[in-house]
């Protein structure tokens, strides 16, 4: 049974919802799944002024904070981040930047990797974010898994990974589940 880590950053809960759907899909695919979040770097007094954050704070905080060194313990890692100006959030970037030692020791080489994102605007740069999130995975020598051609992609997601605009709709969640299941199936074949 493949072990999969779904790791995400979210402030308003949209990326968290996708993370949960990705995890559900991976479980459907027969994997053992952990869902964790990256450390938040925005000061609490700033976050508390965001009504979207206040609504989901307790649920967000219920997820354990991941540590970079634990990535090596999984067969597959699926990274999720909100889109910020066409790239991943600084919190996710900082977390990935802390994987330098794993890179030097080639600890993630051969592991399966995939990505997902959410943003607030239809043209906010989701595909650019997905592509930029894949670059560190390539640098680590990970085996990248995207989404195959599917009718669901006509309305939601991208070949590069799952994506949503605003609160994820049912189509978005279905594509996220497809991604999780596909990663689980590929990881199982490689284990």
From Swiss-Prot:
Gene3D superfamilies: 3.40.50.360
Annotated InterPro entries: Flavodoxin/NO_synth, Flavodoxin_CS, Flavoprotein-like_sf, Flavoprotein_WrbA-like
Domain Flavodoxin-like: 4-184
Superkingdom per UniProt: Archaea
Xref: Pfam families: Flavodoxin_1
Obligatory cofactor(s): FMN
Transmembrane segments: none
The protein, known as: NAD(P)H dehydrogenase (quinone)
